[in-house]
Each structure stands twice: as C-alpha cells, then as structure tokens.
C-alpha cells in the first residue's frame, strides 16, 4: 500500500491514509482527520510506528531524517551516505551495514543508536568489535560524536571486565573473543537491548564463537552487523553471518550444506566453485542491507587521507622510552645535529613498527600485535586491491610472514626482488595478488598501480619526495575510483612525521622540535638545535 503522507516536524506526527487494520497493529484508538474528502490517521512519527506501518504495507519516511539533531561535538556534518545508512538502521531491528571502508559506518550506527535512545526506542548499547578498535575507534568516536554519553571498554581479566561492566554507562564495548568470558553476565543485562557487531565477517565460519553469537544476539531488540567485505573467500561466507542476524528470513537455507549447494557446485572431489549469480543470491539473504562505496560519498575529495591511532604494547613503550632517553643522554654537549636526530628518529619509528635494527642480532622483534591486527582488519575490510608500504626490509619480511600465516594472497617488492616487472603486471592486470607489500623507495617512479584504491602506510617514510611519489602510484590516469590513504600511528614522532609530510615540510624539523622540548623538560638550561640557541 502506498499513499501520500504528511510529516509534521513541529508536532512529531505523521498523517497516513486511514486503514482499518491500523487499529489492530497500533493496538490503541487512532485519531483521524479528514482532508480533501480523504480520511487520515494521526500517528506519532517514531521508529516504533514506522515498523508498525511497514507491517501494514505502508512505507513511511524514516523519522530520524525529520526529528534528529545530527550535531556532533567536533562539528562534523554527516555525509548523505551516513544519513541514508542511519535511515535503514533505525527503520529495521535487524540490518546489515555493508558500506566500504572510509564511508563512516561507525558514526552512522552511533547516530542511529542515539536517536533511538532519545526516542525511548532503545536502551543501552553493546558494541562487539575487534580488539584493536575498542579504544581508538569506538571509544574515541563516542567522545567525538556524543560526549554526553558515557562509554566503557570491557577489557582485561574476567574480574576486571565484570568490574567495568558494573560501572554505570550508556555504551559498553568489548572484543569478539572477550565476549565469551562474561557472556552470561551480559545476557542478564536486560537494560542493554541494542547490539552492534563490527566486522561481522569474523563470524563467517562454523566456530564456537559463531554458534555462541547466534544464541546471544537473539535476545536483543536491535542488532546491526557491520562489514565492508561480507564474502572475503566464497559466497557461502554469508551463511553463518545471516544465522546471527536474520535466521529463517529471506529464503536462507536451514543448514550450511543446503546453502553451499544453492551457491556452489562441485567440480571434483576437493573443489567447489560459485554458481552463476551466486554473489547476488547471497546478498538476497543479507537483507535488509545498505551498501555504499567510497565513490558514493560525494562530499569527499578524490583522495582521502586518514590516520589510525593504535596503542603501543608495554614492551614497545618501554623500548621507546629507553631509546628516547639514550638519545637525550648521548647529546651531553647539548648540540643536536640533523644527522644524530635522523638516527634517533629512525630508531623510534622502528620501535613503533615492532622491528628494530641492532648490531647483534640483526634485528629485534617487539610485541606489536595491535598494529598487526589493525592491518589485517583493514585488509579484510577493503573491497579492492591494496598496497602496504613498509620502509625497512626486516619489517617487510615480518609482514609477509603475517600475510602468509593468514592466507592473504600477496606479492613482495623490495630492493632485492627479482622479476619485479612480472609481479607488478600481475598485480595491475590480473586477479592475482590482493595485496602488494613494498618498500616505498622501490615504487616511487613511473609505475602505474591503479588496480589498487587503498594505500596503507604501516610506518612513515621520512622523505617527502618518496612519500608523494609512492602515493602517486594509484593516483594516475586510469584510476576510476576514489583513493584512500591510511597512516598507522602510535606515537608523537609518527604523528609529527605524517603531519609534516601532509603539509610538505621537512620531517627532521618536527623531530628536532620534539627533542628540543624533551631536553628542556629533562635538563633545563640552554642548548643548541641546528646551531640555534634556545632559552
């Protein structure tokens, strides 16, 4: 049933053509008004009413577009894509948010929950997300977007998580694997009725984690699954995700065997391949859904530059402090040159990356799981090919092993790589290699790699020329999509380097300024930086 409707922003009401079955669906007497010989029902324009109208075959406009203040504390105005995403989320108690990386999924669903919360349609929120995103993505985004809401990150031992869960808050945030430690206690919290599953595709296999989530998710009023790449391997990847959000809906088969037969066919004893139209059919099971690419965000420029904060491990923090202290002690004469500053800066950047050159053995590997996990999550989210830049050979070797361990199809290019042209042609012109892992100095001139749309800087390079030329590999004639440049950072030295690269200044200048500040704090008095006397 489709008819003209009138929405009043002032009264928060919607007028819809009257239908007798509305009395049963609404469950209370309905006020009516006659206009131009047509009888209209006067209803509150709320998410609950919208869902009730849909049950009657009436698609009403999403209330969030009419009755929500989108303002955030940092003054960011939502993209139209984010508003459209919030419309879907607030209009359906189960929904798939399949937007690409960089389109603002996190804010979209936070705005959605806050609107429902303000309307009295949702209580508290539980976010289940990758460990590396708990603090620097979700908790920070809550602060930036809605500082009036209190968020608590449930991390640590079971006792620590339970103590954190006992704290009063509006939003609780926990990692996927941490959920099992306090799942019973979370299940008992009836005041938490909205669930966001970030990186939904982690549940694509029949694992204990997936089975537990299938049971756990059913008790929530609102459940939204977020992933930019729901089928990282095969169309059948969607089955267990759908069993969590929409079991028994959209023609989803009852078991995985039936789903596999519907989407794939067997060509020999060990190999199955997708049927024609398998991906489209898999998407019909993932409904209701919204899916936007970075190209759909018209408010963004063609090249989007973003930084991603990651916490250093305790081992990295200790080594970072040691090396910074050693450098300050080394310049006893209080003369800091560009040469010794460059050495110190390089060592600190290596610590942040987790691989440090030393005399014996050749390098030391530090605990950097958070950065590695973040990299893997970014790769899993990307819908197109990617380039990962790492500025040291030992770091490249470590990341290549990480990719191999996680079955990521990749190629490696560094100064000693043979058959470089063959690798680049395969990456650019064939489906081979999902990720190109490279030293930026080996790709900074003449190479066209427009098959990729995303570049991830695992650690910064200190040469502005190499940085710009390396980025230009995907910003060339033939590129048909917007490009995303992601910078991983964990320390002030990395932030300074990236900042200087973006504004085209010498990175050593930024580091010298940092050292000047550190020495003033540590030693006091006067000293020289590049020959300049500073009080």
Please give the residue ranges for each predicted region.
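Conserved pre-motif I regulatory segment
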Residues: 61-98
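Conserved Helicase C-terminal RecA-like lobe
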Residues: 108, 113-121, 126-129, 300-324, ...
